[in-house]
């Protein structure tokens, strides 16, 4: 079973971290202020969770099924979910599979599949990671921040944590993201079931790209002075938005 941590009491909110991260990413936010039962989970191959998929094809569906096993173990009957980046990709699958998932909050993420160029880039990452993961990690993590020079300590901590991952786990997650499905139809048909939170300076997904793909009814919250790591770069605004949602 995946590694998890539970804190607080009240309505259940599940938190899923992003690529190269772990459940410790949520420590940057005072989530106890939400007055909820918070469940934090390490996705397969990340943090303290092993990667146990022996199939030939990497998939986010496998990650989602592993999360479902944790929720069943904890006897969760109804919940909301907050997913950061890759965690939201897994969340999209869970939202589709489980009627018990009332709301999905996509934090610095998107809901469409990779284009052909992005798929090529993912394969390039896999080749680099399998040869020298430290090169990839040292380049990738600072680029997630709007102003990396302001977050040297946090970047070092993130790098150290990512370096503990096996090259195989990083490659697996990369390939799983490469082959993910497009959920544009689901989000635009039922906008009340989804909320987007996004850093205005996110280099991975632009605000204009998001705005061009969403229904006018879909709630998009833009975080100022933040890139892809808005929970670190502007935790105060993130908490303001989460407090309004929950």
Regions found by a protein language model. Give the residues of each.
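Alpha/beta-hydrolase fold catalytic core
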Residues: 1-13, 33-37, 72, 76-77, ...
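Conserved HGGG/HGGXW glycine-rich cap/lid loop of the alpha/beta-hydrolase fold
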Residues: 2-53
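Conserved alpha/beta-hydrolase "nucleophile elbow" surrounding the catalytic nucleophile
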Residues: 17-19, 79, 83-85, 199
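Flexible "cap/lid" loop of the alpha/beta hydrolase fold
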Residues: 89-133, 137
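Active-site loop/oxyanion-hole signature of alpha/beta-hydrolase fold enzymes
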Residues: 30, 37-82, 93, 240
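Post-His helix in hydrolase/transferase enzymes
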Residues: 232-244
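Conserved loop-alpha-helix segment in the C-terminal half of the alpha/beta-hydrolase fold
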Residues: 191-226, 232
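Conserved alpha/beta-hydrolase catalytic His-Asp/Glu region
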Residues: 114-120, 131-189
């Amino acid at each position: 079973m995946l590694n998890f941590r539970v804190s607080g009491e009240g309505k259940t909110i599940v938190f899923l971290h992003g690529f190269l991260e772990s459940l410790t990413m949520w420590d940057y936010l005072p989530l106890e202020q939400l007055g909820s039962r918070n469940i934090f989970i390490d996705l397969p191959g990340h943090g303290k969770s092993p990667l146990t998929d022996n199939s030939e094809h990497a998939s986010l569906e496998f990650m989602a099924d592993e999360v479902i096993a944790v929720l069943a173990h904890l006897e969760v009957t109804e919940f909301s979910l907050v997913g950061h980046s890759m965690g939201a990709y897994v969340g999209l699958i869970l939202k589709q599979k489980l009627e018990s998932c009332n709301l999905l909050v996509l934090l610095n993420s998107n809901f469409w599949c990779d284009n052909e160029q992005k798929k090529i880039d993912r394969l390039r990452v896999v080749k680099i990671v399998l040869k020298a993961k430290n090169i990839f990690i040292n380049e990738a993590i600072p680029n997630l921040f709007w102003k990396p020079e302001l977050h040297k300590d946090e970047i070092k901590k993130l790098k150290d944590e990512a370096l503990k991952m096996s090259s195989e786990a990083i490659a697996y997650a990369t390939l799983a993201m490469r082959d993910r499905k497009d959920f544009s139809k689901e989000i635009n048909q039922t906008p009340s079931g989804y909320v987007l939170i996004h850093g205005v300076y996110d280099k991975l997904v632009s605000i204009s790209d998001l705005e061009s793909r969403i229904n006018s009814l879909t709630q998009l919250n833009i975080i100022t002075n933040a890139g892809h790591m808005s929970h670190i770069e502007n935790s105060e605004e993130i908490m303001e938005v989460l407090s309004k949602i929950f």
